[in-house]
């Protein structure tokens, strides 16, 4: 008989074997996937995980910066030099006569040419005429002046840019000399101010100096005026034509003020950033300003004029600082009289002169500054006293305008070819002028320096405030 088969046990064993094979295959598959996904070795379970260090960027470590603009600052300056009366008496004219009959007046200016040429623009007051000698006139001094044309050549050579032609001697040689004077001066490429060839000429000028536009006016007093409006100068008959001279009369200042105010408005409308007026006024030989001139000056200040420079008294008069009664922020610098640049008005030479002050004059320099915001300010005023030295030390007479700088006093004798007596006279001249202008110059310079300091501090504060607001 055959033995009986155990089929149930076989079935169970078969199922277990298949299950083990499937589980083993699953483990192998999982290990393969893990090794495929990461090539890094397995991390030891006992080590702490590491973190890679990162370098912070500039933006993360520093606050953002704000570029601070520069404060407003000076971008250009214009220095204008003015000097006093060129009074050509016959003794002065005669010193210019050359052996060939021509004239040369270069020696008058020989010691001031550096000052004149170094300024950006230089101006002198021409107190004579150039009528020539072919129009019924000869060369003459007081009371009716007529000088050789060579004086205009000498002022040009010395570095002057403009001659003031409105004064009480403008009409000394009537209309022919009046007009020829303008033609001669303009023919040397120097400008004129105050008198005109035609009534249609503009009665003011604007000079653009280093980018700064300076408006200028020049007026003379007149002793009368006719029905046509033509002025009477120096007691002569009224001019034969009206509209050729800027003038005023003390008995009708309203007309003068109205006219000047109109011209000031016109100059500003035409772009003037600063204004100067030259006034031929006052009384001869007094070293102080009268109430009449002070009142006129105050009115001009109230019109907004920046600088007033006077002439005619033939002596130096004070410097002052005026405050506008209309706009307290506006100030005007004034030199009431520049004195004589050159003349023969010397103590002992002329009976009408009883003071040595007629030998004294000044080189008066004003400086306007333009800032980067296009505003213009009067920022500097300087004054060098001058003395007219009648020098005959080399055998020929010369009238020399001598600049008297106190710090160079020890050099005066050698530098200006002076005798000891002349040196002593020069020292007295310096002291006279300093006594007249010293206090006023200190007042003006102190004010201008304080204003500049305050202005630049305010500019800096404005920049700092803007920078803080931008943060």
Predicted regions span which residues?
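Long, compositionally biased stalk/linker segments
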Residues: 43, 47, 52-59
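Acidic, metal/ion-coordinating pockets
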Residues: 2, 12-36, 52, 59-471
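Ser/Thr/Pro/Gly-rich low-complexity linker/stalk segments immediately outside membranes or between
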Residues: 32-48
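N-terminal targeting leaders characterized by basic, low-complexity, disordered sequences
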Residues: 1-7
